[in-house]
Structure formats: structure tokens, C-alpha cells
Regions:
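Catalytic metal-binding/acid-base residues of hydrolase active sites
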Residues: 9, 29-30, 59-61, 97-99, ...
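Short amphipathic alpha-helix with an adjacent loop that forms part of the alpha/beta core around
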Residues: 14-19, 87-89, 116-123, 199-201
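Active-site-proximal beta-strand elements of phosphoester/diester hydrolases
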Residues: 1-9, 26, 90-99, 127-132, ...
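Binuclear metal-dependent hydrolase catalytic cores centered on His/Asp/Glu-rich metal-binding motifs
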Residues: 91-128, 146-152
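Core catalytic region of metal-dependent phosphoesterases/phosphodiesterases
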Residues: 5, 10-88, 187
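Binuclear metal-dependent phosphoesterase catalytic core
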Residues: 85-89, 152-160, 164, 171-202
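Active-site-proximal segments of metal-dependent phosphoesterases and phosphodiesterases across multiple
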Residues: 30, 35, 102-103, 125-161
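Charged helix-capping and loop-helix junction motifs
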Residues: 38-42, 70-78, 110-115, 144-154
Length: 202
């Protein structure tokens, strides 16, 4: 059982977090991305009973990009993924924090070659893909009626074919979709206002 969340933005204390085998946070743990904020969230995650806990950064989590050595050290006892893989509970899990550039937030890259180079790193055969942002057309609809997901990521989904793709970033379009063999889930909690997502993989 996978328990997933994103976009808690420091508002994690009131969340009801069900039990499961793997707990995943798909980024935007904080509001301003400071080391004290990250430390507080990491401590909270360690207090939860799940045997495996995976974290990917989001665009608000600045210290993980600007001061990565100090920031990552805060996540001892947790699995922090940045364009990297871990096998937990028999699942190959890949995590990546990047999203298409938007107002110079953390982990922003230009659409096309810059961000495509990151998606090319995702290996085929992963069971669970975690990205902070959505692919184009799934969980990416914002209030102004525009789909803002990453078309390059969508193309690599067709190549990688993960069993499960978890993301957040777009608070307005939480939900679940099927794309070929892949189950796509926007697991945002929208600053702690929405419940944590619980998923069973067959």
C-alpha cells in the first residue's frame, strides 16, 4: 500500500496519514524552502510509522537546490530522490523534482531541451515514477482554464510506462487518470486542505 501526498506547504500537522508500506511526498513540503522549515517537515515524516518514506523536492523547496548538502542532511532516515532511484518494498521508484520554468522558482527548467534532458534519465522498468509537476493533459488544469503540464514528460511516460506516476504542484486538479498501462495520480493536499491519497498496486 502506497500513501502519497504533495503540496503540504508546512501545513502537515493536521493531516490524517493512514498506515501503509511506502509513504511518498511528491514535493512542496514547505512554503519558503528554508532549512528550518525542511527540518521541521523531515522530523514529522520520521515520526510516522511507515517502514519506507520517500521524498522529492518541489518548486517551493529552495534550500534543496541552493544548499543541497545541508538540506539533504536533514532527511536522514528518509529516502530523498533527485533524478535517482531506490528499490523499496519490492518496487523500483524513481524521483525527480523538475517542472517547466515558471517565475524562477526552485527546480525550474525551460521546456524542450533543458527539461527533456532530465526526463531522459528516467529508466524503463520503474514501477513508481514521482515528479513534482504533472505531464501535459493530466492533473494540470489551472483556474484560468489552461493545461500547464509538461509535454516532454508526457512523451517520456510513453517510453517508460511506469505502473504508477505520482505528482502534485497543481492544486486545482487533483485526481486519477489512466494513460495506457500507467496510473497517473495528482496527490496534492492543497496546503493540507485535501486528504492524503492511499493507493494499492495490484
Amino acid at each position: 500500500r502506497i500513501v502519497a501526498m504533495a503540496d503540504t506547504h508546512n501545513r502537515h500537522a493536521g493531516l490524517a496519514v493512514p498506515d501503509g508500506d511506502v509513504l511518498i511526498h511528491a514535493g512542496d513540503l514547505t512554503g519558503r524552502g528554508s532549512l528550518p522549515e525542511l527540518d521541521q517537515v523531515a522530523e514529522w515524516l520520521r515520526s510516522l510509522p511507515h517502514p519506507h518514506k520517500v521524498v522529492v523536492a518541489g518548486n517551493h523547496d529552495f534550500a534543496l537546490q541552493r544548499n543541497p548538502v545541508a538540506a539533504r542532511a536533514l532527511f536522514h532516515g528518509l529516502t530523498f530522490l533527485e533524478d535517482s532511484e531506490a528499490t523499496l518494498a519490492g518496487l523500483r521508484i524513481w524521483g525527480s523534482p523538475w517542472q517547466p520554468w515558471f517565475h524562477d522558482w526552485a527546480f525550474n527548467l525551460r521546456r524542450g531541451g533543458e527539461i527533456d534532458a532530465k526526463w531522459r534519465l528516467i529508466p524503463e522498468g520503474v514501477d513508481v515514477l514521482i515528479t513534482h509537476g504533472p505531464p501535459l493533459g493530466f492533473g494540470d488544469l489551472v483556474d484560468r482554464g489552461e493545461k500547464v503540464g509538461c509535454e516532454d514528460l508526457l512523451r517520456h511516460l510513453e517510453r517508460v510506462k511506469p505502473r504508477l506516476h505520482l505528482f502534485g504542484h497543481i492544486h486545482e486538479d487533483r485526481g486519477e487518470w489512466q494513460y495506457g498501462p500507467s496510473r497517473l495520480v495528482n496527490c496534492t493536499t492543497s496546503e493540507g486542505e485535501l486528504p492524503v491519497t492511499v493507493l494499492d498496486l495490484p
